[in-house]
């Protein structure tokens, strides 16, 4: 029997929502490291006016407040059973609930933070989102939901890099070798995205209609 493989580390990637290209790539040697280890990297990367779509690995009030202090905004999903206080109701209808809330306990790790809780009804299910953009005129409820749905593009990017381009399997166990394969694979991914975009333009089709696998 072949020996059981070992996890080589953990990578963090920021993807541009429009271009689908990686903005930054980080590697941590500890495969069990928490996502919060990438928070300093993100804080150093983002510029004022940026809107981040965050998964629940970055569900951290102190980090959110640090982003807001840098004039960077976010959209994420609220955790089930999360505690909050309603400060203002913008909309409360059959299909939309949009409220200004306060979360946190006032401690260093969980400071008080003011956010919008946007809830969109789909048949009998409510989908709940948090955003630091507190003005509904700037970011209406349905735009919040639509933008967060596009966060799935990061999952698609990881799937392409790991499965189609082979990053699930490493050539070497050395850290330098792993990093070389990591950067090389993402570089190839960027070329594939750029080429697929050119194919979409040539065929006058939306990018989503183009098969990256067929282009590859």
Where are these regions (language model features)?
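Single, function-defining residue in the core of a domain
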Residues: 2-216
């Amino acid at each position: 029997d072949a020996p059981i493989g070992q996890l080589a580390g953990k990578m963090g990637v920021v993807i541009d929502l429009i271009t689908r290209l990686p903005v930054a790539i980080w590697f941590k040697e500890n495969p069990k490291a928490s996502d919060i280890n990438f928070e300093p990297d993100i804080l150093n990367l983002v510029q004022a006016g940026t809107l981040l779509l965050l998964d629940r690995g970055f569900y951290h009030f102190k980090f959110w407040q640090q982003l807001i202090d840098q004039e960077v905004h976010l959209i994420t999903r609220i955790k089930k059973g999360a505690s909050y206080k309603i400060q203002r109701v913008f909309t409360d209808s059959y299909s939309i609930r949009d409220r200004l809330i306060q979360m946190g306990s006032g401690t260093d790790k969980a400071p008080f933070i003011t956010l919008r809780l946007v809830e969109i009804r789909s048949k009998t299910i409510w989908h709940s989102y948090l955003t630091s953009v507190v003005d509904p005129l700037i970011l209406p409820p349905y735009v919040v939901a639509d933008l967060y749905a596009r966060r799935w593009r990061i999952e698609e990017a990881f799937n392409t890099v790991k499965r189609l381009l082979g990053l699930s399997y490493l050539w070497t166990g050395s850290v330098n070798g792993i990093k070389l394969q990591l950067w090389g694979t993402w570089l190839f991914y960027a070329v594939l995205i750029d080429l697929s975009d050119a194919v979409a333009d040539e065929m006058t089709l939306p990018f989503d209609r183009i098969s990256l696998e067929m282009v590859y």
